[in-house]
């Protein structure tokens, strides 16, 4: 190992110490407390208007779930059984508005047609859980108004509309109860479907293309929008890569840990290492690296049997050093993620809600190969909050399972109002 590399990584901000992790944890705690108190904060703590219970809501009828969160639209039926949630009739199609602009009517009608197709197979469906992962204002009746689009969806007339009501209005089979949920809020609710010990504390966590946390505050589930936190120091590589992006300055924490950005950050770190004389960087300037490519290289790709663009851009003698540098990108993401989660674990415990279950979703968290991401995050959380019992669980299709849980929660609230 080149003894100069650890010194370089420390100096440039890619070798966080325990003190650094504690500082990030404290920053998230302060920002969360400020947001809840209505003070200025980089976190938003958006109220989902869904009441929280640590007991899984029960429904014997199937629920239709819609996942509108990216390129693909997915619709299915979900049943809760003794063995856990069971999916049927899962169908994928293109998300309306991703192949060109569409009107509001065309947008809602396309989704209604998919729901009608599943409903024809499940006529006893109790309602619709609508996982709608765009900026919305949640409403007390379970619906939500779209505030802004992202992810290259073009349906401008939908902005300002109640997306649940517009969907239901177009159902051929008549109205159904609907609850509209952010994907991270839905992931938290999915944790209620887990068998095993009861966990009064529940956290929803996503680390994939982006990152976010959902938690419980004042009896309701909140969407923290924690990727927007701006209270931790960034390295020169973070700043340099951010300057190349169309949304420079937005979501600074997210850009330090998540899959949409780690490839670019790693590229900047390798170029900085070349400027420091640690590797020959003559082949790096024209290179563009995705996070998947960076991870493949860090995990060992790039030998004769497995060619790789980064390995091809480096002199063979520099490949081991470059792998050590790439590994640091993912190890820093581990430490930042652990501190991120530890802040919400501590806050849950201090409110009397422990043990804490973290339901984690996202490919960056579960599929990174360069390091044992999940194992290292667990270890570092335990070091930061040694007195709080917690678990991290993976649930297949967590946002869709959580959307179904949201329907059951809404149904329970309606029953309570009728009997009050």
Task: Enumerate the language-model features and the residues they cover.
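A short acidic Gly-Thr/Ser loop motif
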Residues: 58, 66-74, 133, 184-185, ...
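Short, acidic Gly/Pro/Ser/Thr-rich loop/turn segments
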Residues: 73, 135-139, 212-214, 231, ...
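ATP-binding/phosphotransfer module of carbohydrate and carboxylate kinases, centering on a glycine-rich
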Residues: 1-90, 94, 98-126, 193-194, ...
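Short glycine-aspartate micro-motif
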Residues: 61-67, 127-129, 177-179, 202-206, ...
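Short, well-ordered loop/turn elements at secondary-structure boundaries
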Residues: 58-60, 123-124, 174-175, 183, ...
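Glycine-rich phosphate-binding loop of actin/hexokinase-like ATP-binding domains
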Residues: 85-87, 150-160, 186-265, 271
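Active-site nucleophile and cofactor-binding loops and adjacent substrate-binding regions
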Residues: 68, 154-159, 177-186, 204-207, ...
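Glycine-rich phosphate-binding loop and adjoining helix at the ATP-binding site
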Residues: 92-112, 131, 136-196, 201-203, ...
